[in-house]
Amino acid sequence: MLRTHLAGSLRPEQAEQTVTLTGWVARRRDHGGVIFIDLRDASGVAQVVFRAGDVAEQAHRLRAEYCVRVTGTVEVRPEGNQNFEIPTGAIEVNATELEVLNESAPLPFQLDDQVGEEARLKYRYLDLRREGPGSAIRLRSKVSAAARGVLAHHEFVEVETPTLTRSTPEGARDFLVPSRLQPGSFYALPQSPQLFKQLLMVGGIERYYQIARCYRDEDFRADRQPEFTQLDIEMAFVNQDDIILLAEEILTALWKLVGHEIKTPIDRMTYTEAMRRYGSDKPDLRFDIELVECMDFFKDTTFRVFQAEYVGAVVMPGGASQPRKQLDAWQEWAKQRGAKGLAYVLVGEDGTLGGPVAKNLTDAEREGLAAHVGAQPGDCVFFAAGATKPMRALLGAARGEIARKKDLIDPDAWAFVWIVDAPMFEPTADATASGDVALGHSAWTAVHHAFTSPKPEFFDTFDTDPDSALAYAYDIVCNGNEIGGGSIRIHRKDIQERVFKVMGISEEEAQEQFGFLLDAFAFGAPPHGGIAFGWDRITALLAGMDSIREVIAFPKSGGGVDPLTDAPAPISAQQRKESGIDAKPEKKSEDKKSEGDTAEAK
C-alpha cells in the first residue's frame, strides 16, 4: 500500500507515530512561510503542516486537488488551534516527505462551492470527491450489504437474470438492442426481472433475490431515471403476510443504519381508505390533515358547482389570513393540475364565512359547514367537486402543499404504511392519461401488472366484473414515497389467460409474447409472490437527499442525457450497417423450424 493510515482515522492517541497518507489537496494555506494543507481521502480530512526545509519548498507548488503522498509525524495541535468540527481536529501531521503523485488542471468549479447540476454531472468524478455525494454512494453500499445480510440469513439465493431478453410489454416502452447475428431482430433491456423470477419459482429455486438493473424508455418525469435499480425478491409457497414480514425485517435493518428503529408491524391501510382520507395511494402520514367528504352535507344544495358526484374539502389551518394574491395563486396551482380552480371558504375569527363560495350557500349550510369539515376560526377551507378520482387527487395534492406552506412536516420523522387491496384493473383511458403505457387492447388494463393475482374471493368474478376486482397486492409507503411494491402472482395458466382476455390480449398474442411463461405454468408452478424495493429512492431517503440522482454514481439528467459522456450519441454508418437496424427480419418458415428441432434432437 502507498499509505499506512487513512487521513480520517488519525486521533491524539497516535501522537508521535510516523504515518504515510495519500489523497487530494482540499485546501492550501500559507502562514509566514509555513504551509498548511487539508489532505482529503475517502475517510475524511487531516491537516498537514510543512514547516521548513526542502519539504516546505516542495509544498509551495501544491494546488487544489493535486494528488499527493505525505509522510510525517502525528502531533497534537496546540491548545486554541483545534478544530472540533472535524474528527481529526485535535491533531496535525508534521510532514517530512512529500511526493506529488499527479497534478491537477485548474478546476471547472471549486469543490466547496454551490454548483449547478449540469456542471456537477459533467464533472461527476470531481463532484464525487465532495463529502455529500461521496458519502451518499458509500451509504448505498452499506444499504445493499444490510439487505444482503437479512436475505442470506433466510437462505435466499442471489440470481442474475438476463439483461438481453425479448420485448414483453410491462407498462412502459422498452429500450431495444439490435441483434447483429439476426438482422432486423432486437433484444430488449428488461423493465424488471418479473417474468424470469417467476420462472425461477417454477424451477424450484423458492427464495430468490437480486439487486437488479431495470430500464424504461419513459417520457421525461421529474426525478425519474431511464435506468434504475431495485431490490427484487420472490418466494414460493407464501402468502401476503409472509412477504410483508420479510419486507419489514429488511426495512428495519436499513433504517438502523441511520439510527432509526421502525416500529413493527407497520400499519396497513386499504387503497380505498387511503384515497378517501388522503387523496393519494402513497399518503404522507407525518401530518394529520385529512380530506372530508361533503356529498351528504350538500345533498340538497342549490349551488350548482356542488351538485356533483364528489364534493370534498381540505382545511388549511390559519389560511384565512392569506392575501388575495396568494388565494389567486392557488387557482393557478389547481389549473396546472388540470382543474378549473380550487373553491374556498374563509372562516373569520368570529366564525362567519367569507369568500366567493360562501355567498352561494344557504344559511343552514353556512352555519354547519365549519363544524362538518373541522375548521376553526382563522382557517381556510378548500373544496373540489366533480368526478371522484381526479377531485380526490387534487385535494390530496393540496393537502401536501398546505403542509409545506404551513411547515407542518417534521423533517426528522419517519412514517410508514402498507397500502393493500388496490383495484386489479383500471380504465385504459386513466392509465394513458397518467403517462403509462397500457398493456392490451380493451377498455381495462392492469393497475400493477398483468401477472398480479386477484384476491381469492375474486377468482370467479374478476373477468365478468373487472371494476370490482381487488388485486392481491401491497405497496409500502414512507413519508409519501412509494418505496416498494409487490403482489402474490398468478401461478395457474387458466387464470393468467383470463386476465389477458380482460385486457384485450388475444390467445395468439399471449402465446407470442408470453408463451414461455404460460408453458411453464403447465408444469406444476407453485404459488408464489414477491416484492421489489426502489433502491435509488430508499437510499435517497436514508441519505436525506431530495433527488435520486444524488445517490446514483453516474446519473442521467433530464431527458435521459448523460452530460459526462454525452450519451446518447449518433452511431457511425458502419455501426448502423453491422447492427442490422434497417434490415427486415426473415420470416421463420415451419420447415426451417422443423429442421432446427431435428438438429437439436440429434
From Swiss-Prot:
- Where does this chain mainly localize? cytoplasm
Indicate yes or no for the key word NADP. Answer: no
Q: What is this protein identified as? A: Aspartate--tRNA(Asp/Asn) ligase
UniProt cross-references to InterPro entries, sorted A to Z: Aa-tRNA-synt_II, aa-tRNA-synth_II, aa-tRNA-synth_II/BPL/LPL, Asp-tRNA-ligase_1, Asp-tRNA-ligase_1_N, Asp/Asn-tRNA-synth_IIb, AspRS_core, GAD-like_sf
| Quaternary structure note | Homodimer.
Binding-site positions, ATP = R216, D217, E218, Q225, E482, G534, W535, D536, R537
Gene3D superfamilies, per database record: Bira Bifunctional Protein, Domain 2, GAD-like domain, Nucleic acid-binding proteins
Q: Which UniProt keywords apply?
A: Aminoacyl-tRNA synthetase, ATP-binding, Cytoplasm, Ligase, Nucleotide-binding, Protein biosynthesis
Q: Does the keyword Protein biosynthesis apply?
A: yes
Subcellular locations according to the entry:
Cytoplasm
Q: Which organism is it from?
A: Rhodococcus erythropolis (strain PR4 / NBRC 100887)
